[in-house]
Design a protein with these regions (language model features):
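Short, small-residue-biased leader/transition segments that mark boundaries at the very start
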Residues: 1-2
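Intrinsically disordered, low-complexity regions enriched in Ser/Pro/Gly/Gln/His and often acidic
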Residues: 5-6, 64
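Short, intrinsically disordered, charge-biased short linear motifs at domain edges
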Residues: 6-17
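Intrinsically disordered, low-complexity segments enriched in small/polar residues
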Residues: 11, 43, 89-91
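Mature extracytoplasmic domains of secretory-pathway proteins
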Residues: 17-68
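A generic structural signal for short, solvent-exposed coil/turn residues
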Residues: 18, 39, 74-75, 86
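C-terminal partner/receptor-binding element of secreted or periplasmic proteins
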Residues: 75-99
């Protein structure tokens, strides 16, 4: 999905910055997973992976720290996108929808 993105979507990925550390990117498309499903657990947002790859299969639940929620950008992908580091740390989460 993500690696076949049109140029405007690739630029969007490249321009995303971590909400709690705006000098640092959310990382790249390789660190991005679709998470079109979510739940709320005790007031905390939990993203559910819907395009599993590598070590993170479909259905994996990832708690999203509030300070990693990205609300200040649109989202041209049509999917919830979560950026996850090699050790499982969440860099950013962008909710589905938006333009």
């Amino acid at each position: 999905m993500l690696f076949r993105s049109p140029p405007h979507v690739r630029r969007w990925f490249q321009g995303l910055r971590q909400p709690d550390n705006p000098r640092v990117s959310c990382c790249g498309e390789a660190d991005a997973y679709e998470a079109d499903i979510f739940e709320v657990d005790g007031g905390r947002y939990v993203a559910i992976i819907t395009d599993g790859k590598g070590d993170i299969p479909n259905g994996t639940k990832i708690p999203v720290p509030n300070h990693k929620m990205k609300w200040d950008e649109g989202n041209p992908t049509g999917h919830g996108i979560i950026f996850i580091g090699i050790q499982g740390q969440v860099y950013c989460y962008v909710a589905p929808g938006g333009v």
